[in-house]
Amino acid sequence: MNKALIFDLDGVLVHTDRYHFLAWKQIAGEIGAAFDEKVNDRLRGVSRRESLEIILEGCEEKTTEEQKERLLEKKNSIYRKLLEQLTPESVEVSVRETLERLRANRTRMAIGSSSKNTDYILQRTDLLKYFDAVVDGNNITKSKPDPEVFLKAAQFMGANPADCVVIEDAEAGIRAAKAAGMYAVGIGEAAGYSETDLGIKDMREIQHLVSFN
């Protein structure tokens, strides 16, 4: 049976990691929390609220729920402003070429992301047209490494989880894929994770996992 593909968004199809870093760095600076690349690495693949909780570990003063909500809103506002820099040209050629070929082959494809800005990013980069389903932080209750996002993506595509391939760049995403009973492809740092089934350096490498008509 032909495989169905589920892509993470940030760091896989579009590189928005730097925007997240800059936004969280500003928030951390305002509350006096230590923040560097090491802390930022812990935020990859997890929800916005969980990311804030990690940052607050470095803050001596206690934060109320009301303050947390304000910080979350401010972080997203900063991040959304940075996302205005995205254009279709922000997508790597290898990514768009791969998606074009897979779409022409009628391969089922979905997005499985914890981000609540997924639709906005897909629209700005002209990537939405390639996907049969989009599951993101707006329609899940549990973030990665819980498998909910990937199981919903499979359901929306009408695909058996065992026939799905997940492409991820974060450890939480790889763990979620395996928990869903799916084949986990790691790109970037995730290529070397112990639970990764296949590590790749270039998006075009996933094409051999699909049967072409």
Task: Please give the residue ranges for each predicted region.
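Active-site neighborhood of HAD-like aspartate-dependent phosphohydrolases
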Residues: 1-41
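Asp-based, Mg2+/Mn2+-dependent phosphohydrolase catalytic module
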Residues: 1-3, 96, 100-103, 115-213
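An amphipathic alpha-helix signature
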Residues: 21, 25, 48-53, 72, ...
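Helix-loop "lid/cap" segments that line or gate small-molecule binding pockets
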Residues: 27, 49-63, 121, 154
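Short, surface-exposed acidic
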Residues: 32-42, 60-71, 161
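Metal-dependent phosphoesterase signature
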Residues: 56-93
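Short, acidic loop-to-helix structural element flanking the phosphoryl-transfer center
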Residues: 81-111
